[in-house]
A protein has these predicted regions:
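Aromatic-lined substrate-binding rim segments of carbohydrate-active enzymes
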Residues: 23-107, 119, 130, 169-197, ...
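Boundary/entry segment of secreted carbohydrate-active catalytic domains
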Residues: 1-26, 34, 45-47
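The substrate-binding groove and active-site-proximal loops of carbohydrate-active enzymes
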Residues: 10-24, 62-81, 108-123, 149-150, ...
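Aromatic-rich peripheral "rim/lid" segments of glycoside hydrolase catalytic domains that contact
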Residues: 59-66, 302-380
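Extracellular glycoside hydrolase catalytic/binding regions
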Residues: 136, 151-324
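Structural preference for beta-strand elements that scaffold enzyme active sites
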Residues: 2-6, 41-43, 95-99, 139-145, ...
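Active-site groove signature of glycoside hydrolases
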Residues: 99-112, 126-171
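Aromatic- and acidic-residue-enriched segments that line the glycan-binding/catalytic groove
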Residues: 54-68, 108-130, 156-165, 213-224, ...
Length: 380
């Protein structure tokens, strides 16, 4: 009998943040921390577009942002092979499953822009999975999310939707559906035993009911209180003139977030609960088990002056509790920040253990057993 798995998002940080003090300079220590806190799996960027192009090349990655603590705030050189294989071996040694995704990070040559067709998308994933299969590590893979938050233009600039302005959360168009369906079908032909999906975010979860996602094995959906009701929380905190992923945005959070939250704490918690219940019902109507690896309270946060972690942990705990009660989640994170670079969140071992235990004790959605996910959640 399997139970829901506790998973954490290590995105592209696992390979980019390897300088002294960045959190991932010692994979063994970081993964031991995963086990200590009760997590069963990590979700990482496999960089398939780069591995497919030249596995052993040293790539120069450009920063996607300077303010957040995911990834490198400056350009960084990485060699992905055999690093990915070494990381997977370290995970398997600890019986930690690995979900593969990609944020399609920009390198100096912008290789990702070649992925404009589902055929090129499929090829890069097939090539990456072949490297893993050749190393005898396929039993470590939990599922493959072909693109993070598709078709958001941060992560999928190569894809042109119809109409083109439909980017974030607009996976439901005919163009996006055709792209996803074809790409997954091609990868599945080569590796039929793995679960596949594209991950999404956004409030328009009713499209799970209205669009045919039977070619997915799971719905990976990201949900945060701060982005619900048309990002009401961020509007009340204040909008940074130069964009959300900036130091100005963190200054606004430091100045206003606590007051905005505590002035109507019950409202914000109920907003999250309502969003979770709606998402669970829509995924159930689609016949898909849920995975959420980015969640529940605030989207962007870090160790920073006047940004305490207590309210974030409290809100995330409420999200985990309510999601567990729905019985629709097969894979669940505790926050966006269960990683060693977020010291204020990571060091509270007891908090992680309490929430991962809650996840393990939740009911498993019956849909999980009907797909390949039910097999990959187990260790043989």
């Amino acid at each position: 009998m399997i139970h829901p798995l506790a998973i954490t998002m290590w995105d592209f940080s696992w390979i980019e943040r390897r300088w002294d003090g960045a959190g991932f300079e010692d994979w063994n220590a970081a993964l031991d921390g995963v086990k200590e806190r009760g997590y069963d799996a990590v979700r990482i960027d496999a960089f398939p577009h780069l591995l497919s192009q030249a596995p052993e090349k040293e790539w120069l990655l450009l920063p996607v942002w300077y303010s957040n603590d995911w990834g490198s705030p400056y350009k960084v050189r990485v060699r992905l092979f055999p690093a990915l294989i070494d990381f997977l071996k370290a995970c398997r040694a600890r019986r930690i499953k690995v979900a593969l995704s990609s944020w399609f990070r920009e390198d100096a040559d912008n290789v990702r822009m070649a992925l404009s067709t589902p055929q090129t998308m499929a090829k890069c994933w097939i090539d990456t999975l072949r490297l893993i299969a050749d190393a005898g590590l396929m039993d470590t893979i939990l599922y493959v999310d072909l693109c993070n938050e598709f078709p958001g233009d941060f992560w999928a600039p190569y894809f042109r939707n119809d109409p083109p302005w439909m980017t974030w959360s607009c996976w439901h168009t005919d163009a996006a559906m055709d792209y996803m369906r074809t790409a997954i079908a091609l990868v599945r032909q080569e590796y039929p035993d793995l679960p596949y999906c594209f991950s999404f975010d956004g409030e328009n979860t009713h499209f799970y009911r209205e669009r045919d996602l039977s070619f997915f094995d799971l719905a990976e959906h990201h949900i945060w209180m701060t982005k619900l009701n048309k990002q009401q929380f961020y509007h009340e905190v204040g909008q940074a003139k130069d964009g959300r992923f900036t130091e100005e945005a963190y200054h606004l959070l430091a100045d206003h977030a606590l007051d905005v939250y505590h002035n109507k704490e019950d409202y914000w918690k109920q907003l999250l609960v309502d969003g979770i219940q709606t998402l669970a019902a829509d995924a159930k109507a689609a016949g898909l088990p849920l995975a959420t690896t980015e969640c529940w309270g605030i989207t962007d946060y870090k160790d920073f002056p006047m940004l305490p972690w207590d309210w974030v942990k409290d809100l995330c705990a409420r999200g985990v509790e309510r999601a567990c009660q729905t019985g629709q989640w097969a894979l669940m994170a505790t926050s966006n920040f269960a990683a060693p670079q977020f010291c204020g969140m990571w060091r509270d071992v007891a908090w992680h253990q309490r929430l991962t235990t809650m996840i393990h004790e939740a009911p498993l959605p019956p849909e999980a057993e009907k797909t390949a996910l039910g097999r990959t959640m187990r260790w043989e």
